[in-house]
Amino acid sequence: MTISPPEREEKKARVIVDKDPVPTSFEKWAQPGHFDRTLARGPKTTTWIWNLHALAHDFDTHTSDLEDISRKIFAAHFGHLAVVTIWLSGMIFHGAKFSNYEAWLSDPLNVRPSAQVVWPIVGQDILNGDVGGGFHGIQITSGLFQVWRGWGITNSFQLYCTAIGGLVLAGLFLFAGWFHYHKRAPKLEWFQNVESMLNHHLQVLLGCGSLGWAGHLIHVSAPINKLLDAGVAVKDIPLPHEFILNKSVLIDLFPGFAAGLTPFFTLNWGQYADFLTFKGGLNPVTGGLWLTDISHHHLAIAVLFIIAGHQYRTNWGIGHSIKEILENHKGPFTGEGHKGLYENLTTSWHAQLATNLAFLGSLTIIIAHHMYAMPPYPYLATDYATQLCIFTHHIWIGGFLIVGGAAHAAIFMVRDYDPVVNQNNVLDRVIRHRDAIISHLNWVCIFLGFHSFGLYIHNDTMRALGRPQDMFSDTAIQLQPVFAQWVQNLHTLAPGGTAPNALEPVSYAFGGGVLAVGGKVAMMPIALGTADFLIHHIHAFTIHVTVLILLKGVLFARSSRLIPDKANLGFRFPCDGPGRGGTCQVSGWDHVFLGLFWMYNSLSIVIFHFSWKMQSDVWGTVDAAGNVSHITGGNFAQSAITINGWLRDFLWAQASQVINSYGSALSAYGLMFLGAHFVWAFSLMFLFSGRGYWQELIESIVWAHNKLKVAPAIQPRALSITQGRAVGVAHYLLGGIATTWAFFHAHILSVG
């Protein structure tokens, strides 16, 4: 940390705005394509509508003024937040008006969540299944009921209030977006003032946000949940504001409140140990993390972030300067080190977005794993359908975010990279030895692919020939995941040394006992064996191939031996011009396109592994004697070691519910299963067909229209190569994801 004279840093944190920079014009916005001179002239061919969609949010093409681009992004963020709050408000409104939330709250073990009732127009009210408690509707698996229970919501009136609050918030966000673009727009130096931004985000948004949430958990959620856990009827529980206004209600539940704030200021924090706990494990009544543990966590996080938000130098010559930190960061083998990265990240929002998407995507996948290993909400752990769905959801969202990170990194390389700024720094050095990186990564992919797949081929062959003793399995030639087992063991034992007062381990997934809630397994140790070792190496293979494609796209986005002037061709182009064969599918965009298929491939195997493993080895019922009966009876260890086993005992066996769903409340999933297969197959028409074929067909159809004197004013054009691929990959992913959605739902709602 350095202290600098104040005069040098004086300008740093002064907020500077332009007044009324852009007029508010509904006439202009009403004109399609107003942001682009060519598009604004209107459509001549059908390509116009595609370009309109491609460029509407590509602010780089609207203007080259970085300040205006920054303002547009800033305003768009407020618009995005408004859309999110409207969407949340709609979900909460459904919970208030159409759901069985109050019935579920009174008996969460026997009533299943539903927030949608289908109207009987053409007999489709068959979809309203009996979810218990006399309610008929579509079962939902978004986990919202569990979240609301955790918040401390006890009736639909509170949900109505929250839904209205969401709309009010959306209105504020929309106003803020308009105000900060049209009335008081920040100057470029405000957007580039990273120290103030870090202080604000860390301290105000994360720090005070966590502190406020800890306050809600301590004063509202924990007491209400404690009463609910004790079996107090919902109508007898005080309303949220009563806990805050009437201290005696809180003191009855948590005596630590009687001491007031004195222990806080005298550092005698042990007085608060009844509502800021460190129990570990899960609440045996609900199967969720202890809310008092979560309160403690959020309070600690708030303290850390508020301290972190004081670290960076603004107008008081004290604290860190990001530019100085980066420029001093040099190792013995990294040349100029991080010099130039500050300029990259403050002048290229694509570079900034790329790193943020990669981090956020990775974090989302980590969250997917925490949701089952340490279920944060009450009664989430025993709602198997919801567990499966939120795992799948977070895995896929994480995958899309990571691919998006690679996409924007490639756009940065093409549009924003400045070779003068990046001379012999880490980025320049990585680009200069990209051949070594990519060829080694390629070798790793080949090695992993042949060896991991080879183990399965061996097992299928041995099983086909009736030689089980020669297979890789827990009962023949063992390939135990010894490192993973060591890590599990370490995590089970470690809290004994690091947190001696904790009552239970961090997660039962690593070790400990079986936690049953209402006769169902909430969590238990997940034993790993040969089957997990095999599928883990398939995960390693598919993830490395995805990384190979995406990283190659970024490192070769500007140039390659094949096309040295690639940067001049832009981020997306079909081929290097006519007359140069073998140069198609080399643009940055094409690498993202290919990367999406491998991301989907990769993550499908992840969710299949999770779904089968949990049904086989974790989820199930527990009898009075403590014996566990798993949903698929522990068949993972012996069936998942052959490809035939995956096809027969997972895909085929578990598809029976969706295939046989007609005539039942699950029949919509049967229709969806077929429809999504159709959407997937439809994508192949775009992916396996050339542009010329369609252009010829279109011209013959246009001839027929001319003959009938119904010629279109806008000339029809075949999709460009890139547009065709975009439509293809979109339908491929949509079809694949919706097929999986129907397959998972129909099965787990039946058996879970």
Swiss-Prot record:
InterPro entries: PSI_PsaA, PSI_PsaA/B, PSI_PsaA/B_CS, PSI_PsaA/B_sf. Keywords: 4Fe-4S, Chlorophyll, Chromophore, Electron transport, Iron, Iron-sulfur, Magnesium, Membrane, Metal-binding, Oxidoreductase, Photosynthesis, Photosystem I, Thylakoid, Transmembrane, Transmembrane helix, Transport. The chain crosses the membrane at residues 73-96, 159-182, 198-222, 294-312, 349-372, 388-414, 436-458, 533-551, 591-612, 666-688, 726-746. Chlorophyll a binds at residues 685, 693. Its EC number is 1.97.1.12. Chlorophyll a' binds at residue 677. [4Fe-4S] cluster binds at residues 575, 584. It is a multi-pass membrane protein. Belongs to the PsaA/PsaB family. PsaA and PsaB bind P700, the primary electron donor of photosystem I (PSI), as well as the electron acceptors A0, A1 and FX. PSI is a plastocyanin/cytochrome c6-ferredoxin oxidoreductase, converting photonic excitation into a charge separation, which transfers an electron from the donor P700 chlorophyll pair to the spectroscopically characterized acceptors A0, A1, FX, FA and FB in turn. Oxidized P700 is reduced on the lumenal side of the thylakoid membrane by plastocyanin or cytochrome c6. This is Photosystem I P700 chlorophyll a apoprotein A1. The lineage of its organism: Bacteria, Bacillati, Cyanobacteriota, Cyanophyceae, Nostocales.
